[in-house]
């Protein structure tokens, strides 16, 4: 089974280490900031 919470924590750690806001990361990967939020919280899987 996929560990969505673990993946979300790694995404957030990488984002903050690169000093990116959710908004900026969302712009870079062409998704909404809310989608980034849901990934970081383990609520959604990346596709």
Give each language-model segment a name.
Residues 1-6:
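A detector for short, charged/polar N-terminal pre-domain segments
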Residues 7-9, 43:
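Intrinsically disordered, low-complexity regions
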Residues 9, 34-37:
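Positions in alpha-helical segments
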Residues 9-24, 28:
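Short basic helix-loop element that most often maps to the first helix and adjoining turn
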Residues 16, 30, 37, 41-42:
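Residue-level detection of the helix-turn-helix DNA-binding "recognition helix"
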Residues 24, 35, 45:
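Residues in the helix-turn-helix
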Residues 27, 42-47:
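Short, basic-rich loop-to-helix N-cap that marks the start of a DNA-contacting helix
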